[in-house]
Design a protein with these regions (language model features):
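Compact nucleic-acid interaction/catalytic patches
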Residues: 26-32, 37-73
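Short alpha-helix capping/helix-loop boundary micro-motifs
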Residues: 1-5
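C-terminal terminal-subdomain/extension
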Residues: 69-131
Length: 131
């Protein structure tokens, strides 16, 4: 039985998430990674997440990198977020967990928040993402 984390996070929060692989949607990914909350669905206790990766070498349309203010974001290294890869996921312990070394506890799997200076790059990436 899944345990729901409460309270729900807010858009802009960065969470430790088992984002699913494209080939296995509906099942948690094999290991957790950072994910960015884009929307919250209170009626179904779920969040809309975007995929995060430390592979920041190439940045394509619909992607942006947080490479500064890592402490605010709760990230250990620069991280690319892919706004082309979105998933609505239940906010529970099957899909989310506490990140190693992170001390923010509300809501539990929260790592940090998107630093305000990255809102403009995120909006620009959203505007040119694949539809």
């Amino acid at each position: 039985m899944a345990y729901d984390f409460k309270p729900l996070p807010a858009p802009g929060d960065i969470l430790w998430c088992k984002f699913p692989h494209d080939e296995d949607l509906g099942n948690p990914g094999p290991y957790p990674r950072p994910g960015l909350v884009l929307n919250v669905f209170r009626d179904i206790h779920a969040v809309l997440m975007t995929y995060g990766t430390s592979q920041v070498g190439n940045v394509y349309d619909g992607e942006f990198v947080i490479d500064d203010q890592l402490d605010t974001a709760g990230l250990a290294a620069p991280t690319k977020f892919d706004l082309n890869r979105l998933q609505k996921l239940p906010f529970n312990d099957i899909w989310f967990g506490a990140s190693p070394g992170v001390t923010i506890t509300v809501p539990l799997p929260k790592m940090g928040v998107i630093p305000p200076i990255f809102m403009a790059p995120m909006r620009a990436a959203w505007a040119i993402r694949k539809k």
